């Protein structure tokens, strides 16, 4: 990447946006270890690239824990959050890590204190994150500890700011408190994340599937969910389902 270039070339560190898979406290200097690299489209295995482009398989990019100063208004929000948590008697260790990457700040938080953190972000006059714009899930695959993440995008209409909260979960214990009592807009989004990823939002008023039938087996956006499909004939050639295609490596 050249000195004036802002977008990394394919294959360079920083060109992939894989997320972290494990959590460390904010005071620890250790970095996340993703344990895998990103693959391209069409079921590529190995490099799978004969063009010389080099962008079908990229090294895993893992943003390091951020250190003060975070820059801009990020420090103001972080200071306000920790002060509000102290006033509520919530330990500072409930914020496991802070990451600043691509101009966005993410707070990785302990699920046991998620509701208190959300209330502090919503109600504190210096913060005023009044709206939860979206709730989504991520599955980082079986190679990653705490592979399931519940992600919350919060918006302050008062100060015109956006932040992100993430809670990392074990696939064998995918429970996290529902934030519907704090942010009612999270209702249907938590249902969708439960439906697609199997993350269980404890305390949700009606946690049922919202996209798939009620008797559907499994959660379609998990990495270990079978792709399935039916063979498709096209101009005399048959294209098998993705998980039955031949590997050429």
UniProtKB/Swiss-Prot annotation:
- What Gene Ontology cellular component terms go with this record? plasma membrane
> Which top EC class is given?
translocase
The answer to whether keyword Membrane applies is yes
Renumbered to this chain, region (Disordered) spans: 1-29
Question: EC number(s) for this protein?
Answer: 7.1.1.-
Question: What is the reaction catalyzed?
Answer: a quinone + NADH + 5 H(+)(in) = a quinol + NAD(+) + 4 H(+)(out)
Q: What are the record keywords, sorted?
A: Cell membrane, Membrane, NAD, Quinone, Translocase, Transport
A molecular function GO annotation: NADH:ubiquinone reductase (non-electrogenic) activity
**The keyword Translocase appears for this protein:** yes
Q: What is its main location?
A: membrane
Subcellular location(s) per record = Cell membrane
Protein's membrane topology: Peripheral membrane protein
Tell me the Pfam families matching this sequence: Complex1_30kDa
Record family assignment? Belongs to the complex I 30 kDa subunit family.
In its UniProt entry, what is this protein called? NADH-quinone oxidoreductase subunit C
User: Highest lineage ranks of the organism?
Assistant: Bacteria, Bacillati, Actinomycetota, Actinomycetes, Pseudonocardiales
Gene assigned in the entry: nuoC
